[in-house]
Design a protein with these regions (language model features):
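Charge-dense, helix-prone N-terminal extensions
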Residues: 1-152
Length: 152
């Protein structure tokens, strides 16, 4: 048998030296971010979100800034916080929606997602994640409507 080598799909965890199989480097980084968020508690979520947005590469950064502004305007009851190292927006401390930068996960698009706490139900099936390549006026209007519905 050949010795195992460390790849992006096999990481040593910090607890007990066990290997975490099936996680990419960005996924492992997101998990570490989440652990830091839980330990930090609900410190200044707005500042944390703005800092994470500032770290993003274009076009993710511009989209995240605009989505942040749309959410603040259309759903002021939501509070900004980070979630797995990405901007998220919560109601009663439960994440309702979040932005996921495409570059971080080597995806060809960013994502605006909604958790099961969002009121988006439409019959037996409905979308919860939306791919974003750019923010047009039509896309911004749809995001505004989705966010308002999610918190209704």
């Amino acid at each position: 048998m050949s010795p195992k080598t460390r790849t992006s799909k096999s990481h040593k965890s910090t607890a007990g030296g066990k290997k975490l199989k099936g996680l990419t480097d960005p996924e492992l980084e997101a998990m570490k971010d989440r652990i830091k968020e839980v330990k930090a508690g609900n410190a200044d979520g707005e500042s944390a979100v703005l800092a994470k947005i500032a770290e993003m590469r274009e076009p993710d950064r511009s989209m995240a800034k605009r989505i942040h502004a749309i959410i603040q305007t259309s759903a002021p009851a939501l509070s900004a916080r980070t979630w797995y190292g990405m901007p998220a927006y919560a109601k009663d401390d439960k994440v309702v929606c979040f932005f996921k930068a495409g570059a971080k996960f080597k995806a060809r698009y960013a994502t605006l997602g909604f958790s099961d706490k969002a009121n988006l139900d439409e019959g037996a099936m409905w979308p919860t994640d939306f791919a974003l390549k750019e923010l047009t006026a039509a896309a911004e209007a749809r995001i505004t409507a989705l966010v308002k519905k999610a918190v209704s």
